Structures are given as structure tokens and as C-alpha cells.
């Protein structure tokens, strides 16, 4: 598994000089409960490398964002305040959010999530704007801010989110901390390649299994 040596420099080296109207980011946040056993960076759960809050704040996203621009920022419920700080540091103003409800195959809440106070079955996408005249496109005014889908591998977000973003926000598009490549998107991250597949035990409908079904 690759890790980030100097994420800010790596991001500029790959995409510096370009400007994007819409940016999607799913940072590898560091967080844990009082036992430390649910943190992604825990030694028993070496699923992906994480970044400190200062490292995430220091990413030069503002240099890559056009004017106007949209930002979609995935944030765990427990790190809402940190997410708002990141959005501001990246040069965006928070406007609203979208909620991902994780469901089972039968449509009921998927209670396999973690949480110290409540069992989390949702995650947030914070939506922010940069510049003037930064409203969503016409489909955005009809799009509800709620998405219910099944979970895939650990931390993998629903592909349906891309369809929402592409309908509601203009390109060019950039995904930060991407898992795999996507047509018409620039991507960056240590798992942002065509050959991405999870290397750990995970749910049956993970990305590699999905790709096999699509080509069968």
C-alpha cells in the first residue's frame, strides 16, 4: 500500500497549473474512539494510509479551484467541525450538505457502522462554493440531498454520487483521494488508478466484484 510522502507537493506535481470547476474529496481522516480500535490507521486495520488534519488543511486545493467552483467534501459525522475547517482552508464557503444513508440489501438501515454515542448509518457530503454566481445547475434544484445505497468496501463511497455531481455541477472535474479512475474526471490519490481493487476482507459487493459482474 502506498502512502503520502508530501501530499501537497504531490498534488501540485500532478495537477498544478490546471483549474477545476468541481472538486470531490474524500480525505483519509484520522479519528478513533477511546479504545483506538475503529481508527483506519489502527495497526490491525491497515486498510489505507491517513493524513493528519494539518496535512489535509495544507493541501493546495485553493490553487486548483476555478472561480466559480463547487466542492463536495466527504466528512464522517464525528468530524463535522474539522470538515468545515478544511472547507474554509481550501477557499470555499459552506452552503449545505448531502446525506448518504447506508442500507442493507432489503433496504433497511445497515447497522454495521461504528459510533461511540450512536450506531452510524449515515455519512455527510459538505457542499461549498467559491466565487460569485456559483449556484448548482438546473438539475440541482430538483435533486434531494439524500442518497440511500448499500455499502461497498471500507470507506468506499457510492458511485451514484458521481451522477449527482455531474448533473448538478459543471466540469472540469477533479477527485481527490480517488479509488480508481473515472471517465471525464482527473483523479489524484494513492489508490487512483485503473487497477484499484480492495486487498482486505470486505463486503461481497466491493469494487472488484462489481467490475467482474459488469464484464461477465
Where are these regions (language model features)?
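Class I S-adenosyl-L-methionine-dependent methyltransferase catalytic core
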Residues: 1-216
Amino acid at each position: 500500500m502506498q502512502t503520502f510522502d508530501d501530499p501537497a507537493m504531490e498534488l501540485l506535481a500532478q495537477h498544478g497549473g490546471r483549474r477545476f470547476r468541481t472538486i470531490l474529496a474524500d480525505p483519509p481522516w484520522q479519528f478513533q474512539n477511546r479504545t483506538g480500535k475503529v481508527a483506519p490507521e489502527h495497526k490491525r486495520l491497515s486498510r489505507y494510509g491517513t493524513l493528519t488534519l494539518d496535512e489535509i488543511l495544507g493541501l493546495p486545493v485553493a490553487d486548483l479551484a476555478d472561480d466559480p467552483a463547487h466542492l463536495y467534501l466527504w466528512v464522517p459525522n464525528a468530524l463535522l467541525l474539522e470538515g468545515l475547517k478544511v472547507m474554509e482552508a481550501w477557499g470555499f464557503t459552506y452552503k449545505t450538505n448531502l446525506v448518504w444513508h447506508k442500507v442493507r440489501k432489503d433496504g433497511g438501515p445497515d447497522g454495521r457502522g461504528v459510533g461511540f454515542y450512536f450506531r452510524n448509518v449515515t455519512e455527510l457530503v459538505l457542499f461549498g462554493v467559491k466565487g460569485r454566481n456559483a449556484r448548482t445547475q438546473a438539475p440541482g434544484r430538483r435533486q434531494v440531498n439524500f442518497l440511500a445505497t448499500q455499502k461497498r468496501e471500507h470507506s468506499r463511497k457510492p458511485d451514484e454520487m458521481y451522477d449527482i455531481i455531474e448533473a448538478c455541477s459543471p466540469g472540469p472535474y477533479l477527485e481527490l483521494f480517488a479509488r480508481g479512475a473515472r471517465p471525464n474526471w482527473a483523479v489524484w490519490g494513492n489508490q487512483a488508478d485503473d487497477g484499484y481493487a480492495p486487498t482486505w476482507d470486505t463486503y461481497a459487493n466491493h469494487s472488484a466484484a462489481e467490475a467482474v459482474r459488469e464484464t461477465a
